[in-house]
A protein has these predicted regions:
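Mid-to-C-terminal alpha-helical segments outside catalytic/metal-binding sites
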Residues: 1-9, 13-36, 84-85, 202-204, ...
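Hydrophobic faces of well-ordered beta-strands that scaffold small-molecule active sites
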Residues: 3-7, 37-40, 66-70, 92-96, ...
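Active-site environment of divalent metal-dependent phosphoester hydrolases
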Residues: 10-12, 44-47, 75-78, 101, ...
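Surface-exposed cleft-lining segments at the edges of enzyme active sites
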Residues: 11-14, 42-46, 92-105, 130-140, ...
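Active-site gating/metal-coordination segments in enzymes
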Residues: 35, 48-126, 130-131
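Distinct, well-ordered alpha-helical segments
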Residues: 50-55, 78-87, 106-107, 135-155, ...
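H/E-rich (His + Asp/Glu) clusters that bind or coordinate divalent metals
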Residues: 160-242
Length: 242
C-alpha cells in the first residue's frame, strides 16, 4: 500500500480537469496501488468558508485510509476556530496556500496558526505553487520564499511541516533543512533528481502526485525503483512518528 501526501479532488477554476471528482480520483489511486494519503479539496481553497467543502470531504472519506488536509487561510479572523473545528472532525493535516491567498510565510498570523497546529498534532502542508507560473495568465500567484518557510519551521519547532510542489532549483535555498521540515516529490520529478541530489537525505521526501493537476502515473515513473517503497510508504510512517 502506498501513501500520497499531495492528493486533490474537486474543481480547478481556471480550466477543466479530467476525473477530478472524488470517486474518480479514488478509483485512479487504487489502480496505481495508492490506498491512503492526504486529500485536499480544490474547492475549499477558493471558498470564502473553506469548511463547507472540507466538511463534506471528511464525511465522504469516512471509513477509508485517506485523511483530509483542510484548507485554512491564516489571515482570516476565524482561522484558529476553523482549525479546532477540523481537529474535532478528524482531519489529518492543514494545507496552507500562500501562493493563492497572498500572505507571507513569516506573517505573525501564520506563525500563530502553525503553532496551534503543532499543539493539536496536525502537520502543516505549505503549498509552494499550484501549477507552472507560465500557465497563470488568469491570476498572479505569489512565489514562495524558501528562507521564510525555513524560518517558519524553526519558529514552530513542535509542528511538522511538509513543503509541497517546490522546484528542484529551489531545494538548495532550504539548506540547512530544519529538522521538522519534509518535502513532497511533486514538482521535483526531474529525471535522476533523487539519485543525484546529495543535499537532502531521501528519508525527508514523501511521495506527492498533485493529481488531478498533475498525472499520477507520471508522478511515479521517475521515482527510482530502489527508493519507491521508501518514498511512497516508509517515509510517511516516519513523518507521523515524529
Amino acid at each position: 500500500m502506498y501513501f500520497d501526501a499531495a492528493a486533490f479532488c474537486g474543481h480547478w477554476p481556471y480550466y477543466r480537469v479530467r476525473n477530478g471528482k472524488l470517486e474518480q480520483m479514488l478509483e485512479h489511486y487504487r489502480a496505481a496501488g495508492i490506498e491512503s494519503g492526504f486529500m485536499s479539496s480544490l474547492d475549499a481553497a477558493f471558498y470564502q468558508d473553506p469548511w463547507e467543502a472540507d466538511q463534506e470531504l471528511v464525511a465522504q472519506l469516512a471509513g477509508t485510509n485517506w485523511r483530509v488536509a483542510m484548507s485554512v487561510n491564516p489571515t482570516m479572523p476565524w482561522a484558529e476556530q476553523l482549525l479546532l473545528q477540523g481537529k474535532e472532525a478528524g482531519v489529518g493535516a492543514v494545507r496552507l496556500y500562500p501562493c493563492l491567498h497572498g500572505y507571507g510565510e513569516d506573517d505573525p498570523r501564520v506563525v500563530k496558526l502553525c503553532q496551534l497546529a503543532g499543539k493539536l498534532e496536525l502537520p502543516v502542508i505549505v503549498t509552494a505553487r499550484m501549477e507552472d507560473s507560465r500557465m497563470c495568465y488568469l491570476y498572479v500567484p505569489r512565489n514562495p520564499d524558501m528562507g521564510r518557510i525555513c524560518n517558519l519551521a524553526r519558529q514552530c519547532e513542535d509542528t511538522r511541516f511538509l513543503l509541497s510542489n517546490c522546484l528542484a532549483t529551489e531545494v538548495k535555498a532550504l539548506l540547512p533543512l530544519p529538522e521538522n521540515l519534509w518535502l513532497d516529490t511533486a514538482g521535483l520529478r526531474v529525471d535522476g533528481f533523487f539519485e543525484n541530489q546529495q543535499d537532502i537525505p531521501p528519508e525527508r521526501f514523501l511521495f506527492g502526485s498533485f493529481a488531478p493537476l498533475q498525472c499520477i502515473r507520471s508522478s511515479m515513473c521517475l521515482l527510482p525503483e530502489n527508493q519507491k517503497q521508501q518514498l511512497m510508504w516508509e517515509n510517511a510512517q516516519t513523518f507521523f512518528e515524529k
